[in-house]
């Protein structure tokens, strides 16, 4: 009799519906889910959400060409000192990373997300990629003309449509975040990233940037065919000393406000969801710490 009662209790418990936490309920608003999730997170998990790592496959390929000493000390090729690619799954499962880049296959994206599901809170990963003129880092993707060539068309609708298609192809391979548009103003032809920009005219750059943002995000970026856009690089990387990428910028406040700021103001007005800080110094102050 006791066993029958015990079995009945066990079966009743097993058959009860599993109630997910509010942050796991897709029917709630993002704000409601975040309010529920944040108090559950440790400080380490919160910091982890701000950490972006290079994809495991990318790191593993580079490791084959590096010495033990380089592996131990150097992060110049997308490495992290004393962290081997074989250790990355555990880093994800312990909630110490929130985002990845250089993930170029759906298979790897799915694998990374499975590791994230095994973490304490099961927070999905945000995966970003440089889809500047199509999702061109992915084999088989549609590759469009570079931004400089797109700008020469003066065809905003064409640029928007190209980025709508890019968003679809990104989502098909597991990416959610495109590191574009590059709305730097190209002022020195020696600079190696001129072709990645929409040119030297502040107005045209701003309009092309908005068309790119609209195509990628399509208003609200939520949905299976939309991604997050990223306006970069804030600010003034397009006229570096001697034309060398990442070198300092010495520039007047007037030139910043008249030429370099307007495209970013247009991006904000268009609802861009993210900015990327510039990698250069501006009048002696690193952009990342300005």
Show which residues each predicted segment covers.
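Glycoside hydrolase catalytic-domain context in secreted enzymes
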Residues: 21-290
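Residue-level detector of intrinsically disordered, flexible termini
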Residues: 7, 19-20
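Sec-dependent signal peptide recognition
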Residues: 2-11
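N-terminal signal peptide c-region/cleavage motif recognized by signal peptidases
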Residues: 15-16
